[in-house]
Amino acid sequence: MISVVERVKYTNPVFVEAHISDIHFGATDPAKQFKILKEQFLDYIDKLQVLDIVSINGDIFDHKFMANSDAVMYACNFIELLISICARKNATLIIIAGTALHDADQLKLFYHYVGGAADIRIVERVQFEYIKGKTVLVIPELYNMGREYYEQFLYNSGYYDSCYLHGTYKGAIFGKDTPELDSAREPVFAMSHFIHCKGPIIAGHVHTPGCFDKHFYYCGSPYRWKFGEEEEKGFLILLHNIETMQYYIHFEPIKSFRYDTIN
């Protein structure tokens, strides 16, 4: 069976993308987190013959940290290495704001990279990003914004090629079974909200990878640090032809810490 690296090498889709989320630097030993990401994510995407977009779909951090903490140091090292890969491959890096208690306004640590050697988009409000002819709706996790705020992007701005977000999809989290854009907390999305999306919706927030209603995908988190997450961990590779609207998503597993829940 041909590997995804070889599939990228021998085919020529319009876009080749890597999606990762819920990194949560500082949830466990950040040195070990960095080692896993360096060896199994950064080194992997560096081998791809083509790379157009890398998207971090929320929650780089686990909570607010002191600037001199190991979590901040390793997170900055990770982003710096990722930017160097993107610069060499002429890839766009999208960094999406995640849960407020996790990213905690710390994406400012990366503002100084914007306008540098690589094309970097740090997204902290809902907006469209235009990347090499591809239109992407990007939705960070926001609170109490109201239905009209989201509807102007979802329904009143025309068609778009794909959507990347950090957030909640109906049925993906216990107790979140009803779609709701007017929530006092974060909205709960459903496929009906993405009727103008011509491609996949790829999200962070839920730590187990999965697909809902055929076109909504969660990356899952890249490693384990607690019980109850025995499912495979990893990241997504997206091959997306925006002309034919065909796409292929490959889940690339990451070897991680093992936790066994015994009932």
Placement of each model-derived feature along the sequence:
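Core catalytic region of metal-dependent phosphoesterases/phosphodiesterases
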Residues: 13-16, 23, 27-130, 193-198
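Beta-strand-turn-beta hairpins that frame and shape the catalytic cleft
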Residues: 8-18, 128-138, 158-162, 214-216, ...
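Accessory, non-catalytic peripheral segments of nucleic-acid enzymes
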Residues: 2-13, 53, 240-263
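Conserved beta-sheet core of the metallophosphoesterase superfamily
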Residues: 175-247
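Active-site environment of divalent metal-dependent phosphoester hydrolases
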Residues: 24-28, 62-65, 95-107, 129-130, ...
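Conserved catalytic scaffold of divalent metal-dependent phosphoesterases
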Residues: 97-192, 222, 239
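Short amphipathic alpha-helices and their capping/turn segments at secondary-structure boundaries
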Residues: 2-12, 36-50, 149-159
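Active-site flanking residues adjacent to catalytic metal/cofactor-binding acidic residues
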Residues: 20-21, 57-59, 97-98, 165, ...
